[in-house]
Amino acid sequence: MKVGIYGQFYHTDSGKYIEELLIALDKENIEVVIEKNFLNLIHLNKTVSREYNHFSTFKELDSSYDLFFSIGGDGTILKSINFIRDLNIPILGINTGRLGFLATIQKEEIEQTISSIVHKKYSISERSVLCIETVPKSEEIGEGNFALNEIAVNRKNTTSMITIKTWLNDQYLNSYWADGLIVATPTGSTGYSLSCGGPVIVPQTRALVITPIAPHNLNARPLVIRDDTKITLRVSGRENFFLTSMDARIATLSNATEITIKTAPFKISMVELQPDSFLQTLRKKLLWGEDRRN
């Protein structure tokens, strides 16, 4: 078995868990390859002394990898897909962050997790991905034109609203007067979209949700659409530029830009340990069914 490991940051209190993970993988004779910057942080903090093979970019990974560990929070998983893209390498998130909707493995469960992986006591959840195209083409977006959670447009350098004209499959839908607009996948429905009043969508649902950010017209509600819908956006406002975000990546676009958002031709595979499920994660993370009044 061969695995990749990626982390954005190295926190002192996470050092022992990183060491525990590497030791557990070594015990099972699993080949480990670590992202170069994260490996440098591990060596700098003297977590381990031995050398590991490393990778730096998407081009250095291939289908020979059986698994990809993301160490951090949900933001780290979102950055992990920059390395995975369409390689179909399953991602498993070890949560050393806070909420952890995607990074569902707690750091205290590492040894048990490795045992489950070795004995194949896990399932794969296929998650849809969004891709964005712009006319004219944006160099800022480049090859990173995809998102696991959401693609959003936001105002820039102004406190005034922007107007987002929206078409679905070339049919006019609405002009949103708002701070911005979110197009989220089912995976992203528990993130930015949820905080703006959007619904929770079960991951395997073939749907997307369009959620306005602080709309001027309170009748502008989130809209759930089929995931094979082509979404076209045109932005106007007092400023000549606006922001577009693809998960954690941001690009500045001019108001002359036309955006097209579609479901990508590939999916991201997420590892789910038995008997974990999305519904259990909802109950744990959102405290559903718990009475905290006393």
Question: What is each model feature region?
Answer:
Residues M1-L67, E108-S123, T134-N145:
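ATP/NTP phosphate-donor binding region
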Residues S14-G15, G75-S80, T190-S195:
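Short glycine/serine/threonine-rich phosphate/pyrophosphate-binding segments
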Residues L41, G97-L102, V200-I201, H216-L218:
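Short gly/pro/ser/thr-enriched loop/turn and capping motifs at secondary-structure boundaries
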Residues K79, F83-T96, F101:
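Gly/Ser-rich helix-loop-strand patches that form or flank binding pockets
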Residues R98-D179:
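Catalytic core of DAGKc-family lipid kinases
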Residues V153, N169-Y172, A220-N294:
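ATP/nucleoside-binding phosphotransfer catalytic cores, i.e., glycine-rich phosphate-binding loops
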Residues T166, G188, T244:
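Short aromatic-centered micro-motifs
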Residues N174-N219:
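Gly/Ser/Thr-rich active-site loops/lids in small-molecule metabolic enzymes
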